[in-house]
């Protein structure tokens, strides 16, 4: 064993496996740690046993001539939490805008603003960014305004198979049209 300086070989192997984007061959491990292939295999087996005994968060896999690390399945719930995308919270204004688009599509920004009575730029930008709506072309009207429609992601987000599954609007109980395209409680 011709090591450059005294070192914890299991620790060195663990570091190599941690930074390697792919499995390492025994030969590559031996070359890197300046060991024989047989010595490298001993270090691999010792580290594998040590990780198993200590119930660490990682496991060493040794198959044929390749060695790699994975996370221990027992801890998968924590890993999923770490990488789970944050919940997509939509403001009341954004939900109102989305409802208008869902029920009136295809619809322009101006039409949305006439119904809501306020600007819809921010809500539309949020819905586009989250992929819940998309541009559906341009309306054949002066200025050729962009028209919007919902996406497949919208259906998935709300657990719908099609727009036909949208609940019917009950304008008598929830909102009434005051004749000016403004809805009031």
From Swiss-Prot:
The keyword Protein transport does not apply. The keyword Cytoplasm applies. Its main location: cytoplasm. NCBIfam families: SMC-Scp complex subunit ScpB (TIGR00281). InterPro entries: ScpB_csome_segregation (IPR005234), WH-like_DNA-bd_sf (IPR036388), WH_DNA-bd_sf (IPR036390). This is Segregation and condensation protein B. One of its GO terms (cellular component) is cytoplasm. It is found in: Cytoplasm. Signal peptide: none annotated. The lineage of its organism: Bacteria, Bacillati, Bacillota, Clostridia, Thermoanaerobacterales. Belongs to the ScpB family. It comes from Carboxydothermus hydrogenoformans (strain ATCC BAA-161 / DSM 6008 / Z-2901). One of its GO terms (biological process) is chromosome separation. Participates in chromosomal partition during cell division. May act via the formation of a condensin-like complex containing Smc and ScpA that pull DNA away from mid-cell into both cell halves. Keywords: Cell cycle, Cell division, Chromosome partition, Cytoplasm. HAMAP family: ScpB (MF_01804). Homodimer. Homodimerization may be required to stabilize the binding of ScpA to the Smc head domains. Component of a cohesin-like complex composed of ScpA, ScpB and the Smc homodimer, in which ScpA and ScpB bind to the head domain of Smc. The presence of the three proteins is required for the association of the complex with DNA.
């Amino acid at each position: 064993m011709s090591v450059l300086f005294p070192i914890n070989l299991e620790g060195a192997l663990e570091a190599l496996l941690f930074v390697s984007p792919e499995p390492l061959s025994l030969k590559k491990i031996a070359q890197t740690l300046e060991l024989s292939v047989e010595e490298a295999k001993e270090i691999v087996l010792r580290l594998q046993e040590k990780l198993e005994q200590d119930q660490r968060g990682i496991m060493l896999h040794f198959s044929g001539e390749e060695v790699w690390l994975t996370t221990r399945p027992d801890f998968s719930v924590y890993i999923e939490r770490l990488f789970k995308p944050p919940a997509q919270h939509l403001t009341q204004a954004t939900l109102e805008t989305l409802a208008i688009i869902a029920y009136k599509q295809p619809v322009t920004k101006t039409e949305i603003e006439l119904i809501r009575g306020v600007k819809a730029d921010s809500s539309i930008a949020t819905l586009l960014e989250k992929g819940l709506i998309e541009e559906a072309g341009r309306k054949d009207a002066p200025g050729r305004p962009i028209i919007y429609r919902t996406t497949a992601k919208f259906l998935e987000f709300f657990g719908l198979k099609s727009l036909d599954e949208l609940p019917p609007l009950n304008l008598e109980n929830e909102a009434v049209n005051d004749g000016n395209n403004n809805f009031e409680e």
